[in-house]
Amino acid sequence: MGNFGRVPVGIVGASGYGGVQLVRLLMDHPEIELVYLGGESSVGKSFASLYPHLAHAVKLSIEEVDPEVIARRCEVVFLSMPNGLACQIVPTLLEKGCKVLDLSADYRFRNLTTYTTWYGVERSDRTTADTAIYGLPELYRDRISEAQLVGCPGSYPTASLLALSPLLKQGLIVPETAIVDAKSGTSGGGREAKTYLLLAEADNSLAPYSVVRHRHTPEIEQICSDLAGHEVTVQFTPHLVPIVRGILATVYATLRDPGLVGDDLTTIYTAFYRNSPWVKVCESGIYPQTKWAAGSNLCYIGVEVDPRTGRVIVMSVIDNLIKGQAGQAIQCLNIMMGWDETLGLPKMGFYP
């Protein structure tokens, strides 16, 4: 028997780290009833067998992915699938009236040629893709409120774009000088076994990867171009660090007005995000740490100016699995449903 008045929700791809974050958060959401978990490799297994620590709370099993069945049982569907799979079922889910939030890259791009170039997947759902709204609430809250399909941002783009947006929107920097130096914890690599994520490989080490070819680069550039009003190219370099959760994106760019100081930028950022409950701008001289955000849906931002070089330095930290993935998707759902944007989401981290 369902909970009267609660919205029935399903998750496809519940067995990964993003999926289990969705399960955990949605189980505590006061307006949601989780009624369906779907997947491929884990079909028939109880969710508790995959995550025993949630056995007392989650009694569902992993079912086959059948969009007809999903649509009959769910009003809202979260898709936490590998890239290239969501686009195979989203058109049917939309046709059946479901609201869909896709956590893969399939619906983040306005230009599907760009998607195909970077992800190697040919698409036949251009009409559907044209209806998708990019799910960064701090920039596109009004569009999200009217959306049926949301393409949720990647974790690196979330941290990077929240750092860059005030600078680009207000024309404070030379856009082509923007450099994003980002570090992520190992959970960003997913739950499947990978050599580079083994403790013996990742511990006591810091490693750059996918230099000049990371797939989040065109996603960052797309939104930067939107904000600047012209095409922008960004230098983006990711690094793996030996922590489980967290992203730190440090952004460098040349200021148009070399007379601006750190206090000026802090005031500008505070005003820009005054209506964004999940972004906290640090006081001048305070620089954020990944531990502050771990376990929460918050983004902490610190801003500084180097008068010697005329550059601004912006530091942005998030939990890659919450604000960078599951939490932000639920934030978008809250907006789509007309609920409080903070409903059901963790407001404080695990600290220490």
From Swiss-Prot:
Molecular function GO terms recorded: N-acetyl-gamma-glutamyl-phosphate reductase activity; NAD binding; NADP+ binding
Enzyme Commission code(s) on record: 1.2.1.38
Domain of life: Bacteria
InterPro entries hit by this protein: AGPR_type-1 (IPR000706), NAD(P)-bd_dom_sf (IPR036291), NAGSA_dehydrogenase (IPR050085), Semialdehyde_DH_NAD-bd (IPR000534)
Keywords assigned: Amino-acid biosynthesis, Arginine biosynthesis, Cytoplasm, NADP, Oxidoreductase
The keyword Amino-acid biosynthesis belongs to this UniProt entry's keyword annotation: yes
GO BP: any one term: L-arginine biosynthetic process
Subcellular location: Cytoplasm
SMART domains: Semialdhyde_dh (SM00859)
Broad class of enzyme this protein falls into: oxidoreductase
Entries under SUPFAM superfamilies matching the protein: Glyceraldehyde-3-phosphate dehydrogenase-like, C-terminal domain, NAD(P)-binding Rossmann-fold domains
Family under the similarity heading: Belongs to the NAGSA dehydrogenase family. Type 1 subfamily.
Role summary: Catalyzes the NADPH-dependent reduction of N-acetyl-5-glutamyl phosphate to yield N-acetyl-L-glutamate 5-semialdehyde.
HAMAP family, sorted: ArgC_type1
Protein name as it appears in the record: N-acetyl-gamma-glutamyl-phosphate reductase 1
Gene: argC1
